[in-house]
Amino acid sequence: MHPRFAKPLDTLSAPLKAALLPMLGDDFQARFTPDQVATLKAATGLDDRALRLALLPLAAACSVAPISKFFVGAIACGLSGNWYFGANMEFAGQGLFHSVHAEQSAISNAWLGGETGISEITVNYTPCGHCRQFMNELSTAKILKVSLPDDLSALQSFLPHSFGPADLDITDALMSPQAHDELTLVSDDPLWQAALAAARQSYAPYSQGYAAVALQFADGRIFCGRYAENAAFNPSLPPMQMACAHAVLGGEDLATIRRAVLLESKDGQISQQDSARATLKALGSVELEYQAV
């Protein structure tokens, strides 16, 4: 078990703690299957919403917030029935625009886990405007519920007179299946192959700047991030930030990155290269490897 979970575990009820412990091994990927959820519910007698609220301290324990010291956790419910942790992440010494919000982290975890939508997101603080706009891009934005410790409401109630993809004549949505197979690369390098697969599933209907980052760590594990664009532009989530957030949820230390690659479309209107290099520079001395295809 990752040591970050030790303290929040001690705050949980004895039945919940006992049921959780076998699930929080070194291979825990910050998600729970429907069978695991059923086990936790049976052990505690809690319903879905109450159980997610009880688990929030564990999600918040994944937070990396050296600037704000404000630790936020989120849990996204995938349409498959899986639950996905998310936590906010900040980069010490870097502009605040590099930050990843907890809701973005949980949604990214679900998207990278193969989900095509989420039905509900549980968070320990009211979503900020940035996150409300980010969630309004989702395939399930019209039906998405936001669960807070003292409230359960539709996302749309947080966004009266909302602006979204349809206002820019876009019929696609974040988390809808993507297949940008026009992106090709001849390489037998597993890291570049991972980046290519992720880039083909990225979402960039406004700039066509399909892109992904793949990070390899000292233990050999690879974590990817896809570009997630937004109708309001600024809430778009860059692939480097998503990859870092995904790795942290997986228990990695970003100081142990050994290789980092960025693959993006050469035909896009934008490039992630400068942003990715700046983020990576804040984490250590690894040089970004780059290809536009």
UniProtKB/Swiss-Prot annotation:
Q: Which domain of life is it from?
A: Bacteria
User: What Gene3D superfamilies does the annotation carry?
Assistant: Cytidine Deaminase, domain 2
Q: Which SUPFAM superfamilies match?
A: Cytidine deaminase-like
Q: Which reaction does it catalyse?
A: cytidine + H2O + H(+) = uridine + NH4(+); 2'-deoxycytidine + H2O + H(+) = 2'-deoxyuridine + NH4(+)
GO cellular component terms given for this protein: cytosol
Q: Which UniProt keywords apply?
A: Hydrolase, Metal-binding, Zinc
| Biological processes annotated in GO | cytidine deamination
Key word Zinc present in the record? yes
Annotated Zn(2+) binding sites: 101, 128, 131
Residues binding substrate are 88-90
Q: How is the cofactor bound?
A: Binds 1 zinc ion.
Uppermost EC category: hydrolase
Where, if anywhere, are coiled coils annotated?
none
Q: Which PROSITE patterns match?
A: CYT_DCMP_DEAMINASES_1, CYT_DCMP_DEAMINASES_2
Keyword check for Metal-binding, yes or no.
yes
An example Pfam family from this entry, by short name, is dCMP_cyt_deam_2
Active site (catalytic residues): 103
Cofactor(s) listed in the protein's UniProt record: Zn(2+)
As recorded in UniProt, its EC number(s) are 3.5.4.5
Which parts of the sequence belong to the CMP/dCMP-type deaminase domain? Answer: 47-166, 186-293
An MF annotation (GO) of this entry: zinc ion binding
* UniProt similarity note: Belongs to the cytidine and deoxycytidylate deaminase family.
Assembly description: Homodimer.
Function (record text): This enzyme scavenges exogenous and endogenous cytidine and 2'-deoxycytidine for UMP synthesis.
Name of the protein in its database record: Cytidine deaminase
